[in-house]
């Protein structure tokens, strides 16, 4: 018997009603895994545990620690409403100010702009001693040594979405690819 090319076999498939139903159910299940706010949707990377929404947060993800790190990381997706939450530049400055170098001055930050699915996105990458835990209303300001912050601001049709991924530098580095997956999954809903 002569081998038959795969595409020839695929074109001869007959989809039964049961196969069609299973296909639709699988597509619906995949879309339910996507989260959304402000006219945008995204999909969290596998291995990141969703902790759901919190006040001012559309989503929060817990990331397990990398080998050698005592603490895990957190990725928060913020949405404050149309025209709320401050400008892109104001948020970049605030995030830069939360990370300091060994000299106590704000740490250097890499800022980049790109487009993902026709959405303007500005990213920040900075490392150092992190003093942004607990948010601006925290009673005390504890500082976490050797942390890294990857952030992104996605300019959506109903307002900006702010993504802030913070944690021990090694844990964030081990999950940088997953953070990129998260960013690349953002699209209009």
Kindly give the residue locations of the regions a language model identified.
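Solvent-exposed coil/turn segments that connect beta secondary-structure elements
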Residues: 80-82, 127-131, 158, 166-168
């Amino acid at each position: 018997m002569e081998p038959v090319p795969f595409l020839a076999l695929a074109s001869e498939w007959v989809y039964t009603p049961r196969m069609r139903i299973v296909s639709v159910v699988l597509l619906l299940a995949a879309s339910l895994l996507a989260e959304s706010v402000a006219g945008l949707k995204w999909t969290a990377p596998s291995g990141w545990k969703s902790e759901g929404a919190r006040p001012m947060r559309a989503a929060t993800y817990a990331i397990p620690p990398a080998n050698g790190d005592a603490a895990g990381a957190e990725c928060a997706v913020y949405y404050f409403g149309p025209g709320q939450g401050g400008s892109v530049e104001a948020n970049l400055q605030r995030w830069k100010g939360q990370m300091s170098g060994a000299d106590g001055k704000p740490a250097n930050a890499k800022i980049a702009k790109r487009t993902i699915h026709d959405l303007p996105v500005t990213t920040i990458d900075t490392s150092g001693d992190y003093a942004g835990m607990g948010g601006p209303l925290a009673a005390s300001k504890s500082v976490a040594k050797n942390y890294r912050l990857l952030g992104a601001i996605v300019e959506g049709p109903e307002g900006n979405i702010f993504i802030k991924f913070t944690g021990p530098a090694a844990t964030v580095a081990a999950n940088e690819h997953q953070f990129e997956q998260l960013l690349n999954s953002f699209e209009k809903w």
